[in-house]
Every structure is written in structure tokens, then in C-alpha cells.
Amino acid sequence: MAYFLEQTDSEIFELIFEEYKRQNEHLEMIASENYTFASVMEAMGSVLTNKYAEGYPNKRYYGGCEVVDKIESLAIERAKKLFNCQFANVQAHSGSQANNAVYHALLKPYDKILGMDLSCGGHLTHGAKVSLTGKHYQSFSYGVNLDGYIDYEEALKIAQSVKPEIIVCGFSAYPREIDFKKFREIADEVGALLLGDIAHVAGLVVTGEHAHPFPHCHVVSSTTHKTLRGPRGGIILTNDEEIAAKIDKAIFPGTQGGPLMHVIAAKAVGFKENLKPEFKAYAQLVKSNMQVLAKALKEKNHKLVSGGTSNHLLLMDFLDKPYSGKDADIALGNAGITVNKNTIPGETRSPFVTSGIRIGSAALSARGMGAKEFEIIGNKISDILNDINNVSLQLHVKEELKAMVNQFPVYHQPIF
């Protein structure tokens, strides 16, 4: 599958093969990661990577775009059908690029953004001070209650006080559903636009397994990987023609040059996969598997942020533990379970250490694992955390789990 690469750069070839083996042998439980469809990877590795196509279908600055025009148009139409909206821009290189383009389109420098606090589950692009959005705009944040749920009353009070031009509802580490209707009511109360960032839950949204951002949000952004299982990239959606025109200009020429046509083709392929009936069954499995995992951990007396989960991820709370999120990340990694350390509400440790870990079910569900496997995984996670310094136990668990994961290959033939 990679004949030329093996011949011309054996060093990179071997490293890619090493990563292929790692993905096969480890339990991938980082909530933002997934195994993309094999068809998506084939589209990404096509001759489309050779083509520049600045502009939009039938409005290009380069010649020779008659084929890629058809490809991008197909991606747009499939995105509109998938998300049940009237306008879609499929050129954003990433979710962060998509969010920055929305701000560029709809805000002026130093306008006000209200988004979820980073330690409560928000994303860097929702106004974090260290990000571009926190530097180019005035950013404010809302958070969660003591029970770990979004505090909508607090969000309203903050919005009334600061009068933001745009409110962002979305997250990178929040285990519950977003109430888009409530956020729209808050936005209308203060005359703000509402951006729904569904990067994490898009695969659940399009299958009816999570509340839909439309008709409540003025504009919606998402990545195309994560729970959608498409290529790494971003999309922007709206039902407002005026906003759509501004978004297009904000992407090109506002924040990007040439679109990545091989990625746009892969997005189109991914959207077609998402429209199939079996994708709904996958989304249901993602949610049910996470419920099994949460139950197993709670039965072992482990504390979860918000007490559980309503989507594809959960957050473990170590605020009252002698070990940190970083410690847990390393210990579980030694056992072949890949998670990520994560800040949590009430955080007392550094963002590089943290008091929690984030765990997702999307990738292992894509491999076909079900309730039986997730119960086993929950028990093994508990065993590791309850004896966190026992390296021999970690290595023993790794071998046990390797025997299990070998029954669920990532791909049925080498693709790398």
C-alpha cells in the first residue's frame, strides 16, 4: 500500500508502520481521536493533493478546476444534507480555523466573545487568553455549577453585564448535552449572535443522538474527524444567506489561501459514510459504551465530573487524590490505554499536570467493541488507578488488553 514510500524513505515508512502497530495494539481513548474510514484515507492520498483551487466552485482564480469544482460542490451538498442546513463552507483546514473565520466574518477587533471557561471544558478558540481569540477580541467566560453542569443562569448574568457580540456554546471536555435553545434565549436577550461549536459531538448530532444546533444557532462550526470519522478538517454551517457570504469571504481570502482539495474530497467521502443507516448504529454504540464505562468506574467509587456522561466522553476527577491527571495519563499509557490529562472544574493544579483525565469511546466503538469490552476496560482502569505506582501491574494489564484488542483490528488490511 506504500510501495514508493518504502523505497524512497524507509525511515519514515518504518515510523508510520510503528504508529500503525501502536494504534492496533493500544486502546485509543482520547475523546478527540478516532479511526477514519479507509475510503477517506484513499481520497486523501489521491492526485487531488496536486491541485490549487483558490476561490470557490465556478469562481476560481486558477484554471483547470472543472473537476475539483464538482468535488467541492458534492462535499457542500452532502454537508447541507447531513446537517439539514442551507449553506456550508467545507474549506476550513481545521476546527480552530473554522472558529477564527467565524470571528473574522462577524466581529470587529476588540469585540466581545463569551465562551465556556477552559477549565470547565471550553476550547482555546472560545476566548482563552493565550489564544488568538483572547488577544484580538475581549473575551469573557461562563462555567459550570458545583454539580458539573453548565450554569445557564450565570451565563445569562454575565451576558447581560458584558453585552457580547457573539456567544459560543460548545466544548472540548464537557460530558453533558448542550442546551442550544437556552443559549439562543440568552443570545436574544443581549442581542448577540450564537455560534454552536459541535466539533466533539457532530457525529451524535447528525444521527439524532444529541440535540441539534439548528434552528437555534446563527452559525455552526465543526471538525470533520472526531465522532464523524472523516478527515482532519473543519466546516462552517448556517441558514443565513448574509452570514454565509461573510463566512466565505472570511475563509478566502480572509484567513486561508488555496483549499486542500484532497481533504475536501475526503470530507465528501466521510459525509457519504455519515449518511448511511449503519452510522446511526455506530453513534448509538458510542453513547451506550460510554454509559457502560461510566457505570463501571462509579461502581468502583471513582468520581466523575457531573456524576456521569450524556455523550461520548467522561472526565475523571482527582481533586481529592494524591495523584494527578498527568500521573494517571502515564500509568494508563503504560497499560496500553491512551487517554489525556485534562483540567476540570475547580482545578488546583497546573494545566500541564491537571486534576483529571478525559476518556472517550468513539475510537474503540469504531473497532466494534461493545458493552462487554467496555466493562473490562473500566475495571482495568480502576485497577491501575487504585495502585498507580505499580508498574508491573501496568505491564501485566497491557498484555491482557493486547489479547483483547487483537480481536478488533483497526483496519482489515494495512493502510498507512
From Swiss-Prot:
GO MF annotation terms: glycine hydroxymethyltransferase activity; pyridoxal phosphate binding
EC category name: transferase
Subcellular location field: Cytoplasm
Name of the encoding gene: glyA
Cofactor: pyridoxal 5'-phosphate
Principal location listed in the UniProt entry: cytoplasm
Reaction catalysed by this enzyme: (6R)-5,10-methylene-5,6,7,8-tetrahydrofolate + glycine + H2O = (6S)-5,6,7,8-tetrahydrofolate + L-serine
Name assigned to this protein: Serine hydroxymethyltransferase
Subunit description: Homodimer.
Annotated family: Belongs to the SHMT family.
